[in-house]
């Protein structure tokens, strides 16, 4: 490989290297803000280090959490049940999700349009997690593994404006 080719490869590699080492956008946000668990198993600890004991082990990928504080690579989080503790930032994603809330057996409906009289197209039990793509006028568009519909904003946790 000649010198001109190696310079060309180096110039292509530098932006890729810079992108790979860049800090995620989520790490730059100021709390409070929303995030979601991004691993099949995530530990909530009593403090911001692996030296602190584990309080909870979450096995719900995409579960929404509220970020309350930051300390280096650690985030103080609150889960849908109100439990607070610390998680490493690599366990979290900036993808905004929500969990359906309500009493056991209380089904929430997803509608075709953001209106109380719109056609019911899906039903979701409390605990179902989906991705939020928009929230307006008391309704959020929720995507649960490709099944999309509008759900009343008070029927989910993980959507309210923060700050």
Labelled PLM ranges:
Residues 49-52:
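Second-shell loop/turn segments in exported
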Residues 11-21:
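Bacterial N-terminal signal peptides
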Residues 25-46, 57-61, 68-71, 75-83, ...:
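SH3-family beta-barrel domains
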Residues 2-13:
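Bacterial N-terminal signal peptides that target proteins for export
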């Amino acid at each position: 490989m000649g010198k001109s080719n190696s310079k060309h490869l180096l110039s292509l590699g530098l932006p890729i290297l810079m992108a790979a080492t860049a800090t995620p956008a989520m790490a730059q946000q100021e709390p409070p803000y929303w995030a979601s668990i991004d691993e099949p198993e995530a530990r909530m600890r009593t403090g911001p280090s692996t030296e602190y004991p584990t309080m909870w082990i979450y096995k719900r990928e995409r579960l929404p959490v509220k970020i309350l504080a930051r300390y280096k690579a650690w985030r103080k989080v609150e889960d849908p049940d109100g439990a607070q503790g610390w998680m490493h930032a690599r366990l979290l994603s900036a993808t905004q999700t929500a969990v359906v809330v309500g009493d056991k057996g209380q089904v929430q409906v997803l509608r075709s349009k953001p209106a109380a009289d719109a056609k019911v197209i899906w039903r979701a039990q409390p605990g179902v997690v989906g991705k939020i793509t928009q929230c307006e006028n008391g309704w959020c568009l929720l995507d649960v593994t490709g099944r999309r519909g509008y759900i009343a904003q008070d029927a989910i946790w993980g959507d309210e404006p923060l700050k």
